[in-house]
Every structure is written in structure tokens, then in C-alpha cells.
Amino acid sequence: MKKILIGLIIGLFLFSSVNASVNLTEVQNAISIQQGINWAEVHNNTWYYPPYLGEMFISEYYFELLVLNWTHKSAFNATYFTERLLQTQFEDGSWEQVREQNLETGQLDATVFNYWYLKSINNNPKIEAALQKARKWIVAQGGIEATQTMTKFKLAAFGQYSWEDLWYVPLFIFKQNGIFKYTYVKDIVAQWVYPHLTALAYLRYQRTVFNVPVADLRELWINYPKNGIKISPREYSTLNPDSDLLILMDEIFKLKQPLGSFGAYTISTLLTLMSFKDFQSKHPHLYQNEIQKAYEDGYYFVEFNYFNFREAYHGSLDDGRWWDTILISWAMLESGQDKERIFPIVQNMVKEGLQPKKGIGYGYDFEYAPDTDDTGLLLVVMSYYKEAFQKQIPETIEWLFSMQNDDGGYPAFDKGKNEDNLLFKFAFNMAGIANSAEIFDPSCPDITGHIMEGLGEFGYQANHPQIQNMIKYQRKTQNKWGSWQARWGVNYIMAVGAVVPGLARVNYDLNEQWVQNSINYLLNKQNKDGGFGECVLSYNDPEKWNGIGKSTVTQTSWGLLALLEVYNQNEQIKHAADRAAQYLLDQFKRDDNTFYDHSTIGTGHRGLLYLQYPSYAQSFPLVALNRYQKISQGQYHFSKNLYNGNGEPVQKQNI
């Protein structure tokens, strides 16, 4: 009994001491400074923080510049980039894809491409020393044979891998007529797959090898082919190209977007332009004007992204300005900034980005592919201007409801592109393409949570039939730990941070056990410093890594947003939320009064490829700290009109 009393006294002391240590003046100070930073970063009525994939894509770009004859006009500076690679190489010789503070070694494909670039321009002793270390590391990881299929496709285009050792992509999957409508791949794969697949299919069909000076990589093989790399380009008729090839070319041209991209991505655009280069060399009388225009526009698009004013040389994948603007507008509005001052920014975004009777695109050149996640949080922003957008709001809500999958959850771009096409799922796995990208666009809990949050701002509640289906989806997909695997952010921490606030906005009873399980998950995963963090390896080995990693400000904000919805349930939750808020303040000071993520927090392709989203650190901490401040001052609204999983009213207050 004596030990129990001592434990209770110590526990109460800890709770009270941490509560008292969160200085609300410091909270407001951090909020004000971040608001000022955000105002200083507005350009042309948008916030723009390009997401990036890492330097390996700039290494690739060096070779693509040679193919496209752009070296004389590109902003690429070989001296600068070479020094950058030498400085970022790990001691073991590897390079990371994007920054990950939880790992002390790199990624194989990134290391192969960076090695290849350095070997191709090798002009000083420092490079040779870096190559020796990298070569040893690559071979230890299994060599070129162990790289992803996408890497092998790119190596094959430069004679470093045999096309015949890669699976053939049949061209009939790009046909729509007759019986082929059942195998038309555009209607089956995710939006982000198709513009890459069309170009890869072309290069594989032609077995294209570009005749440009590149370094030989035979030393990176474990078992280099006895007869060398087989170079066997397909025979062709200049005047009479294959009809299937022309159908593929027509499909590719349909992907061209207003700013010059093919599909809105830098990588798909470069692969497409390289395909055009090959096609033009074989059939110079066809598509002359279209291809010339594609070169001109494509050059602008790629250079704009790869050497932009904010993330130059980081390998920016695309333009995501509407997503960035949504997030930061939301953060600024919620934290009390002047609505009228922000209105021109929101008005511009709605005018330029929101598609009529649909959703909003992720950024420039995504007009053809509205994004449900972005649209869900756009609703939150538009809720501050209901009168100004009284026409757009109901149309946007109607579109969102139309995009719900049969399982109750939400995809990113396309309804009905779950993994239930077993034939294509098997084919992509057999071809090895599934080891380079996510092929389908299934429902995901993070998007579904954001959409619930947006709909909740317009009075939709947990008794609405479609929202009941969303809740059933969340319950069904919850894992044994009480969390979910997130699709677009790392990872189980992010999912709880999206699901719980979404449930709260639609007045769902957060006392239900399955929701409590997700809160308990967070309590068990909080780091000693008060923050939350999670390594990207949680996708590859969830049993070991779920919810584990060094703290970041964005992941801490996600965790805090969930905890705040149940802040008054008990002292343990209060204590955890206080610690998370204190971590944000401490990290803000450590990073010279800025919010910055020291690890990758964005997901491109789970377990394969990751994206860093700089805008997350400019927005989520601001939302989380503002809500924390309001709760601490008794100003945060908790709903009393609650519903259970059957959509029935709950006769008790949530907290």
C-alpha cells in the first residue's frame, strides 16, 4: 500500500509539473512567428513547397540531358551537384533516397544512380575515393541484380542491362476497342502509374538503347552476363510503323498537360520525351510538330521543378501548390489570421485549381485528376467563406460523395481501382513492376479521415449513411495495435492523427473502445522527448517499426491532433498532449524559431519510394499548437450530440 501511495504521489507530481511547464505565452509566440514566416512565403497568391524525391533523380537527369540534347541550356551545374553528392554520402559509401534520421545507411537504387553519375564525370581524386566506398556497399547489397525494376528499365535504356531480361509490356493493354476494353490498363491502374507505364512500354517494345557517353557499370554486378549486355533493338520500317505502336503514341499524346508535362510528373515526362527521341529517329515524318512542341514545353516543366527557387537539386516530383496552399491556408485561418487577408489566396486557388463540379487538383497540370484528399481539406478552408463559395461547396461535396469506394473508404484519384483485379495484380507482380511502384489506388484511412473532417464542417454527422460507411471502413481496417497503415504519410502515427479528428468532426462517440484503442496506441508510442516519430521501415517491417522513430514536428503534430480530441478524458492523455506540445516548442527553438522535419514524413510508394513534403512542417504544427492553446484556455468546442457506430444518438457527453 505504501508503494502504491508513493507511486500515485509521484504520478500526480509529474502530471502537474509538465502541465505547468507548457508556457502558453511561448505557444502563442511560436504561433505568431510561424504565421509571420508563412506570410513572408506567399508568392502570386499561393504557398508553394515542392515535394521532392532526392538527389538520385538529379543524377538520372544528367543522363537524360545527354539524350535530349539539353546540356547546353539546362540550369544543371555539375560542379555544384558533384560536391553536394560527395558531402551527402554516408560513411559506408551509400546514399539515402530522401533524408531519414532513423537510418545510418542508404538505399540501393539511389546509391547506384549517384555512383553512375560520379563515375561518368570522374575528374578528381575525391570522386574516386567515393566510388570505391560506394562500389563495395552496392555489391554487398546484391549489386545491380537487386535493384528495383524501374532502375533496370532505366539502365537498359543506356545499355547497362539487357531489355530481354525484363518483362515485355504487351501493347494491346493500351487499346480500348472491342474486347480490349476489358484489358485497357488506364481504367485499371492508378493515375500515377499510367503516364509512366506508357513510356516504359514504348522503350521496352523498341528495346531502345541511346548512344550517349555513359560509364560502364559491369563492376556493380554480382554475376555479369558471360556474353555481356545484349543490345538488340527491334527492327522497324521507317515509313510503316506498327499500328499498335501508333495507338500507344496516341495514348501518350493524350497525357500532355497545359504546362508541358506528361501526366504531371517530372519522371513520366522525361521518360516520355526520351521515347519521342527514339521515335523521331526512326519515323521522322510522323508527329513532327507535336514532338517539337513536347520538347519545348517539357523542358520548361522539368527545369521549373528540378531547379525551382525553393528545393533546387532535390529532385522535385511535381507541382503541388494547391495542396500546399490548402494546408497553410487552413493553418492560418484556424490560428486566427484575418479571413479577409487570406481570402484572395483562397479565391485564387478555388478559381484556378477547383474543377467544375469536381474536386481540386494537387497542383499545376493535375487539372485532369482531381484529388479527394486535397478536396476534403479544401472543404475545411471553404467553410470559412461559405457565402463566397455557396455555388462551389455543394458541387464539391456531391463530387466527394460520388468518389466513395464500395468498401466505404476513399482513394486518392479514382474510384474502383482497388487491388481486386487479380489478373493485373498477378501480372504486375510477375513483371516486377510492383517492386517499383504502387499499382492501384485503394481506399486509405488517412484520406477518409480528412474527408470526414471536411464534411463535418458543413454539418454532416455520423448518422449520415455515407459517413456511416466511412466509419465502418475505419473500424474494419483498424489493425491489432489500434492504428491503421497510412497511404500518404509515415505512417501508423499519421493514420491516427487523421482518423480521430475526422471522427470527432462528424460527432462520433470517441469513447467507443476501438477509438480508445487508437489513443492507447499513441500513448504507448510517445517518445521520451514528448514527441512522436516513425521510420519509413514501418512499411517494410511493421511488427518491429510501427510507431517507432526519432521525433519530428509533423508526426508529433499528427499525434497531438488526435490526443486533443480526447484531452479531457483522463490525466494520462492530458499529460501526453502537454508533453507533445512542449516537444514542438522545444524543437521550434532548437531549429532557430522554425518548424522543420529532420526525417521523411511523406509516402510516395509504400515500402519503395518516399517523398518529403516541406509544407507539412509549415502547417500541421500551427494547427496542433493552436488547438492546444484553445483547449488550455477552455475555448475548444467538444460536441455533446454524439452518435455510435450504428448512427444512433449517444445519451452522454463525449468528454
From Swiss-Prot:
Instruction: Give details on activation and inhibition.
Output: 2,3-iminosqualene and N,N-dimethyldodecylamine~N-oxlde are effective inhibitors with IC(50) values of 50 and 30 nM, respectively.
Does the keyword tRNA-binding belong to this entry? no
- Could you identify this protein by its name? Squalene-tetrahymanol cyclase THC1
Q: Which organism is it from?
A: Tetrahymena thermophila (strain SB210)
Q: Where is the active site?
A: 373
Membrane topology term? Peripheral membrane protein
pH and activity: Optimum pH is 7.0.
Lineage at the top is:
Eukaryota, Sar, Alveolata, Ciliophora, Intramacronucleata
Outline what the protein does. Answer: Squalene cyclase that catalyzes the oxygen-independent cyclization of squalene into tetrahymanol, a triterpenoid sterol with five cyclohexyl rings that is involved in membrane integrity, permeability and fluidity.
Q: Where are the PFTB repeats?
A: 393-435, 515-562
Record-level GO cellular component terms: lipid droplet; membrane
